[in-house]
Amino acid sequence: MTSTAPRPAQPPRRLPTVEEVSAGGVVIDVHDRVAQIAVIARRNRAGRVEWCLPKGHVENDETLEQTAVREVAEETGIIGRVLGSLGTIEYWFSGSGTRVHKVVHHYLLEATGGELSIEGDPDAEAIDVAWIPLMDVHSHLTFPNERRIAQVAWERLAGAT
């Protein structure tokens, strides 16, 4: 009797990894002594609405700060001036046959002009934009890591850090 040993299982095929660098920010406007930030709504792959901070990929020879200013303007309609760095968020996701390692650099921006609008978003990712009081933003932002960035902005503005 001939016995055949079971074939060893093939290890799972690893997806190729792609590195992405983005920048965005917390753009602040003070109205009636209340600090507000502009947040955008997007639909995720499952079709659910997610409220998040404006951000996007670095283009050509842009600096991270230039990317943050451009992305905030494109996705919210608000022109801003960078006041400082708020930190970095890193996360992984998979899509289109790759694993993506994304690093997002966030900046605190002061609103200097413009009007809330999603009309300038070239990718048409934003479906809505709103001013939210900074002290209430934790209940509006979908992602905990972005709530942490908003908290850093709050502390920075309050002079705590």
Regions found by a protein language model. Give the residues of each.
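N-terminal strand-loop-strand
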Residues: 2-53
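Generic detector of short, locally flexible boundary/turn motifs and exposed helical patches
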Residues: 2-7, 17-20, 44-48, 69-75, ...
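Compositionally biased, intrinsically disordered low-complexity regions
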Residues: 26-30, 40, 89, 115-116, ...
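Residue-level marker of positions within ordered structural domains that often coincide
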Residues: 30, 112, 155
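Unchanged
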Residues: 58-148
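Short, charged, intrinsically disordered terminal tails
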Residues: 143-145, 149, 154-161
